[in-house]
Amino acid sequence: MNKKIISALLCGAMVLSCAAPVMAADKAGDGQKIALVGKSAGNAFFEIAAKAFKETAEAEGATVDVVYPEAATADAQIKVLDNLISQQPDAICISANDVNALQAKLEEAMDAGIKVSSFDSA
């Protein structure tokens, strides 16, 4: 196999592990609403991971909304998280630009009953 295929498979497996606790909560992913938040639009790594995540979660009955911030900054991701918290998805899986800057907002999401997981976060 070439390196791109192996990378894509590994990315997909990693991202899917983020959804496992959410989809295990119900019978598979039936009715679960999951938001997948990227670092920025056009990030090749995230595009591959998001595609695999979305395909697998939707095959299990979940609905996945892939969301990108306006800029590759923590402040832009905070705006995305504010919007998502008001929508009350079952889970948010985020590739954080700055996990320390997002900590309070992610705790707010968890306090609102939203499951939160992170991957590829610095």
Regions found by a protein language model. Name each.
Residues N2-L10, M14, V22-A122:
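A residue-level marker of the well-folded mature domains of exported/periplasmic proteins
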